[in-house]
Amino acid sequence: MSQSSTVYTTLADVKDALQIEDSIDDIAIQAAILAASRQIDEYCQRFFYQEGTLLAPATRYYTPVSPWYIETDDIVQLTELACDPSFEQTYDQIWNITTPPLDVMYEPVNNPQKGWPWTKILAIGSYVFPYFFPQTVRVRGIFGFPEVPYEVELACKIQAARLFVRKQSPFGIAGSVELGTVRLNSRLDPDVEMLLKTFRRNKGLAY
């Protein structure tokens, strides 16, 4: 997973949570927000921003689980699926993903209606996945999440505030009216873990 400058909360939200009105510590708070965002990515083993666009899609390579499907990283929109059945790194078998009858189906099928990405592609048309060689499937498109979930935004605000106040709390305890008392340590705040538990998945699958 590549590092990103995308963050999941704002400077204003964290300052409001900490009841800070001046701008003296803005740079330090912004650094805490960035660190908290990447901690969330690592904990969930996925990211909540988007990589790639329709004009400049991102590329991933996968090893099929079976002839019938591949498990993928989070996909918002697919722009190309190509396979390399001869294992010559040509990826010249281009699947139909635009005009019915399609060669693919996406799962979980209802995820877009819930604001979630797809994580599996099924072969339902003219081809099967060449599963006997590794990295024989090339997928291009937009990866990540359609929008940052509210729970992730809130988790990032809490975690960023905790990281910022840590340097000011030599006894390991800090707090504010909004955040309450927070015990500071090297792991995510328990409230943050609770907010994020629904979003955790296995380690990224792209090669």
Give the residues covered by each predicted segment.
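Divalent metal-cofactor coordination and adjacent catalytic microenvironments
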Residues: 1-207
